[in-house]
């Protein structure tokens, strides 16, 4: 199978961290401090939303996530985004997901509230499995194309009668 991991950001409250732990999937956390993180494999991004609510979308995407995604290598490996939020904030609920989805041109795969429910966990696990399988199939097709290009095709031998 092609490698796929979860990359996520969680503040010191650890709400997103606890959700990711429930998934039981390979994961890498974007540091809260300014330490850089570079990934070299495909990933799903799980990100909380930090918006004030109403029409105030400023600051919806955490600065650490912006810094992480400013790295072109990190951007190219993102296969989709999942966001969390608080429905008390109305229109800005889980807004970080749609913002990142639009900027990176990747699918918004799921949105959940706060720590997520057991149903959210199952949905994200299913999304991960489906995407991992899809990524594996695409990698297999790419490998076949590469194999076809790098290995010359031998012409069949002609049989001649004596």
From Swiss-Prot:
Gene Ontology terms: biological process: protein modification process
InterPro entries named in the record = Flavoprotein-like_sf, RNR_Ib_NrdI_bac, RNR_NrdI
GO terms of molecular function: FMN binding
HAMAP family noted in UniProt? NrdI (MF_00128)
Family statement: Belongs to the NrdI family.
What is the role of this chain?
Probably involved in ribonucleotide reductase function.
Q: What is this protein called?
A: Protein NrdI
Give the originating organism. Streptococcus pyogenes serotype M5 (strain Manfredo)
Primary gene name: nrdI
């Amino acid at each position: 199978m092609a490698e796929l991991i979860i990359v996520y950001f969680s503040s010191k409250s650890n709400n997103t961290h606890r959700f990711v732990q429930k998934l039981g999937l390979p994961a890498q956390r974007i540091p809260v401090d300014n330490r850089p993180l570079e990934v070299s494999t495909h990933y799903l991004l799980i990100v909380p939303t930090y918006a004030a609510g109403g029409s105030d979308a400023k600051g919806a995407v955490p600065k650490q996530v912006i810094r992480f995604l400013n790295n072109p290598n990190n951007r190219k490996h993102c296969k989709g985004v999942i966001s969390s939020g608080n429905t008390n904030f109305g229109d800005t609920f889980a807004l970080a997901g749609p913002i990142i989805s639009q900027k990176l041109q990747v699918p918004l795969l799921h949105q959940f509230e706060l720590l997520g429910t057991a149903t959210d966990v199952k949905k994200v696990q299913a999304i991960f499995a489906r995407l991992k399988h899809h990524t594996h199939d695409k990698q297999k097709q790419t490998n076949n194309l590469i194999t076809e290009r790098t290995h010359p095709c031998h012409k069949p031998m002609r049989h001649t009668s004596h």
